């Protein structure tokens, strides 16, 4: 039973002359008598047009308008589909962003709906305006559907018919063959993987808890809950995934690592890296999707400004020296390095890489998977590379003094060396190497460029909306008075059928520091990272924060996203 309609919208319609005051009150009374939402009554009785009413509400109340007919209802997190609340308020929760739950409604004055959902789920709530007829259709589809526990009726058989484990994975033993009892699990996991690939997820999380089993996707760096299948299926999920990854099904006490190669079609496949972790309630399994297309990115797609692009290309063109890319896990370091290797990858150049693991196959590049248990470390691989007549060497990560010293030796003896470190800024990379024990003169003479980076979510071009921010706040964030005087046009996320909560894709934010005479002197003097960063900025280095604010200024991302990935 829906809640009684309130008079807020009726008063606005009367004031706008869309309805007379007497008609507005009469229709409101009739809606109350029939226990129908006011908007539903108006549209069902063809008193107002659904689209015209939605357009009026958008202008009157400033609530973003969403085309619900184009929204994929399958993406709605199941745990928020509270039938009682949906029917009571005639609204539909459609997605979350951070700690905010977005509610689709045709009457933006329905504050009680936002309060009830917020109280029930412990989240902040925001309204999204939708057309009444589309809202009614969507609610009907969701509430009338009779799905089984896994929602198998929604799976398109033709869509996943060619999704299978490739031969190299399935030649294990007879345990790969599934029984009839396992068929629904196989089918469901195939659907989950296909959905992850379609939505551009980088990671899949299969997580068992005491009373719940949760599946999440990491999309554009943010985790989203996708499904909550019955908890009693947890062991069958982990068994199937371990079979696909060629892991020991019986071993549940220790972590395991494996790979899955999925055949998507006759000519296309997808590599996945699998890790299992024993927890209190079963095995948590995380699958990393290794997108080979990421290795073929054009440098224009990375997000450099013109100056940064020129600096990176100039460093890549040098016959020797060291290029270091730094940032936290998931900041896009591998993609930046692979893009650089693709630029260098010609028949005249011998390239060798030591990686842990080899994430993406690069034809024409000699890629080595390090295996410390067998004695093949980054350091030992590097030593071998130097006897292989290399031009370019990439080391997945400089983790210790031994690896750092060999990499520097290579960079000083006619080789171009690329590698990564886990530091927060370009300047901190230099002090990290000094703290490892690398002599200052070796750092100053070998390093040519250090690039710190982050990945920020890009605003969806289809739905981003202008954002008004007080001048004082903009100055505090890092914008200059000159930028404010020139005029800023900032945008914020909204959310539509084309995106995930207002964002779609990611873009790199970079801080590039070149080795200069002044910085080399500071290194020799044992200066700290703050002193080095100050000189680098005087010489023209853009910090991560400044680069991020520029991305917000030109409408690529939002201020909220820059605040999330950078510090002032």
Swiss-Prot record:
GO cellular component, one term: cytoplasm
Compartments where found: Cytoplasm
Molecular function GO labels: ATP binding; ATP hydrolysis activity
GO BP annotations listed: pilus assembly; protein transport
Binding site for ATP: 327-334
UniProt entry tagged with the keyword Ligase: no
SUPFAM superfamilies, per the entry: EspE N-terminal domain-like, P-loop containing nucleoside triphosphate hydrolases
Chief location category: cytoplasm
Pfam families, per database record: MshEN (PF05157), T2SSE (PF00437)
CDD domains: PulE-GspE-like (cd01129)
Keywords: ATP-binding, Cytoplasm, Fimbrium biogenesis, Nucleotide-binding, Protein transport, Transport
Homology family: Belongs to the GSP E family.
Functional summary from the UniProt entry: Involved in the translocation of the type IV pilin.
Annotated protein name in UniProt: Type IV pilus assembly protein TapB
Native source species: Aeromonas hydrophila
């Amino acid at each position: 039973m829906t809640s009684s309609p309130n008079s807020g919208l009726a008063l606005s319609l009367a004031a706008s002359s869309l309805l007379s005051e007497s008609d507005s009150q009469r229709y409101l009374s009739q809606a109350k008598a029939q226990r129908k939402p006011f908007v539903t009554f108006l549209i069902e009785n063809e008193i107002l047009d659904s689209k015209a009413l939605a357009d009026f509400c958008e202008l009157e109340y400033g609530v973003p308008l969403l085309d619900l007919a184009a929204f994929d209802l399958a993406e709605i997190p199941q745990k928020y589909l509270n039938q009682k609340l949906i029917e009571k308020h005639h609204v539909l929760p459609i997605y979350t962003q951070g700690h905010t739950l977005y509610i689709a409604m045709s009457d933006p004055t329905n504050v009680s709906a936002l309060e009830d959902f917020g109280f029930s789920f412990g989240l902040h709530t925001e309204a999204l305006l939708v057309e009444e007829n589309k809202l009614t259709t969507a609610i009907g589809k969701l509430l009338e559907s009779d799905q089984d526990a896994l929602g198998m009726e929604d799976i398109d058989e033709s869509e996943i018919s060619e999704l299978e484990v490739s031969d190299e994975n399935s030649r294990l033993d007879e345990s790969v063959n599934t029984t009839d009892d396992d068929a629904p699990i196989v089918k469901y996991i195939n659907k989950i993987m296909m959905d992850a690939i379609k939505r551009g997820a980088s990671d899949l999380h299969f997580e068992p808890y005491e009373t719940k089993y949760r599946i999440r996707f990491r999309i554009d760096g943010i985790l989203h809950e996708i499904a909550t299948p019955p908890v009693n299926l947890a062991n069958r999920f982990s068994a199937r995934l371990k079979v696909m990854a060629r892991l020991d099904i019986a071993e549940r006490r220790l972590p395991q690592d494996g790979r899955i190669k999925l055949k998507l079609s006759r000519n296309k496949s997808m590599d996945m890296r699998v890790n299992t972790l024993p927890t209190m309630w079963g095995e948590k399994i995380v699958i990393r999707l290794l997108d080979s297309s990421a290795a073929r990115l054009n440098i224009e797609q990375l997000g450099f400004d013109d100056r940064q692009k020129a600096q990176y290309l100039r460093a890549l063109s040098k016959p020797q020296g060291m290029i270091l890319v730094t940032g936290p896990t998931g900041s896009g370091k591998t993609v930046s390095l692979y893009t650089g290797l693709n630029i260098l990858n010609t028949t005249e150049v011998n390239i060798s890489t030591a990686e842990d693991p080899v994430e993406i196959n690069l034809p024409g590049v000699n890629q080595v998977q390090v295996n410390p248990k067998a004695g093949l470390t980054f350091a030992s691989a590097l030593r071998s590379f130097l006897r292989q007549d290399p031009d370019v060497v990439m080391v997945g990560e400089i983790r210790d003094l031994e690896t750092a010293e060999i990499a520097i030796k290579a960079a000083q003896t006619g080789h171009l060396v690329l590698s990564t470190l886990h530091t927060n800024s370009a300047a901190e990379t230099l002090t990290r190497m000094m703290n490892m024990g690398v002599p200052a003169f070796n750092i100053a003479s070998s390093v040519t460029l250090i690039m710190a980076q982050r990945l920020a979510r890009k605003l969806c071009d289809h739905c981003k909306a202008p954002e008004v921010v007080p001048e004082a706040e903009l100055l505090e964030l890092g914008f200059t008075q000159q930028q404010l005087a020139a005029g800023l046009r900032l945008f914020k996320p909204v959310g539509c059928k084309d995106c995930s909560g207002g964002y779609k894709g990611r873009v790199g934010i970079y801080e590039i520091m070149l080795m200069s005479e002044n910085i080399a002197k500071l290194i020799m003097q044992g200066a700290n990272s703050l002193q080095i960063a100050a000189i680098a900025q005087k010489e023209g280095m853009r910090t991560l924060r400044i680069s991020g604010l520029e991305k917000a200024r030109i409408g690529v991302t939002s201020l909220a996203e820059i605040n999330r990935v950078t510090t002032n």
